[in-house]
């Protein structure tokens, strides 16, 4: 049932590799340290079946850890072995998958060895407050002399009837920092010694950001 698990990794950047045909392929590098099962949820006790994974263990004295985390989290960590984690992620799985794992079990990048495609979820790069031309690709207004709305959105409504702007129109707003999932990325290589995997193409987030990797359920059409 390892195929249903999602692992927490870190985006290390991008690089180029040559495939077997000699083509240059742009790849994203994801490092995946061993993930620990921090909690098991069942339909009888929680209403659904899920596995909570913990990653990026905190290496600090016990007194320092007690100051950084609440008592509720410290008690939660003790149930899975006492190690405190910076990142906790939960994945919904089947009842058989919950029964096949135990608290404290470790899973690493080896579960993706032999997998052809994966889905990667992360937080996209923040771009700040942006206008409609950058965020939505609007054409903008005339660029000639005398024009007063070069980068404006244009008309956003009527006059006295209805006397308001309809909600849902595209306006200047904050861009980025969204939860994004890129599906069906090809796995180029899994390096068990370095605990990294290479996937073809780009993944969301900046260098060093946390991503969640899982096996693809199917090909996106």
UniProtKB/Swiss-Prot annotation:
UniProt keyword annotation of ATP-binding present: no
One Pfam family linked to the record: Ribosomal_L3
GO cellular component, one term: cytosolic large ribosomal subunit
GO molecular function, one term: rRNA binding
GO BP, sorted A to Z: translation
Family: Belongs to the universal ribosomal protein uL3 family.
Function: One of the primary rRNA binding proteins, it binds directly near the 3'-end of the 23S rRNA, where it nucleates assembly of the 50S subunit.
Protein name per the record: Large ribosomal subunit protein uL3
Organism from which the protein derives: Chlamydia muridarum (strain MoPn / Nigg)
Organism lineage: Bacteria, Pseudomonadati, Chlamydiota, Chlamydiia, Chlamydiales
Gene coding for it: rplC
